[in-house]
Amino acid sequence: MAYPMQLGFQDATSPIMEELLHFHDHTLMIVFLISSLVLYIISLMLTTKLTHTSTMDAQEVETVWTILPAIILIMIALPSLRILYMMDEINNPSLTVKTMGHQWYWSYEYTDYEDLSFDSYMIPTSELKPGELRLLEVDNRVVLPMEMTIRMLISSEDVLHSWAVPSLGLKTDAIPGRLNQTTLMSTRPGLFYGQCSEICGSNHSFMPIVLELVPLKYFEKWSASML
């Protein structure tokens, strides 16, 4: 969950998000080192009285500034590709949920059950209870089992939307006429909030997403009560 004045990411709740956090730290360190080197060279150029006006050719320098950036790019690309493949890999999901975007609400269908579907609308500010979050609470939460692989099928009934839950490392476009898929697995129970992340009209900011991750036995009780 995000909090005021937050400068970093939300706490990771899935293996994918943990990998993304490690990759961010890895890349940020490389950027920091490069920036420090560039600032150091600039400061030397501004303060030193030594100049090299007669240098016409420097093969060694050209070799270094060609090979070194290539190595740095490889160091960034390899872990990035690894995470991309991990995000696309879906092996034997335990549950499939179909998500449809609308202007301006979400519809969910548990395809493994015969008749388990519902719409999820934002609760207006005037109807919020004490302790509930403004513009983030919904009338029907998406209840899912924790520590299980879940496949999300995502599409749209009208315009472009984007189904995003930051703490799970999820962001998948909802495109009319196209069915995208992603996978999620939570390592701990709790409420996890997200929002539509694609400008979709005047009420774009009123399309929250709330996932309630619970142990399997509680999910089974909930699904039985919904049928």
UniProtKB/Swiss-Prot annotation:
Give the source's domain of life in one word.
Answer: Eukaryota
The Swiss-Prot or TrEMBL record describes its family as follows:
Belongs to the cytochrome c oxidase subunit 2 family.
* Protein name from the UniProt record: Cytochrome c oxidase subunit 2
Identify the coding gene: MT-CO2
Q: Which organism is it from?
A: Capra hircus (Goat)
Q: What sections of the sequence does the record tag as coiled-coil?
A: none
Alphabetically sorted, this entry's keywords are: Copper, Electron transport, Magnesium, Membrane, Metal-binding, Mitochondrion, Mitochondrion inner membrane, Phosphoprotein, Respiratory chain, Translocase, Transmembrane, Transmembrane helix, Transport
- Would the keyword Membrane be found if you checked this record's keyword annotation? yes
> Which positions bind Mg(2+)?
198
What stretches pass through the bilayer? 15-45, 60-87
Cofactor stoichiometry and binding?
A: Binds a dinuclear copper A center per subunit.
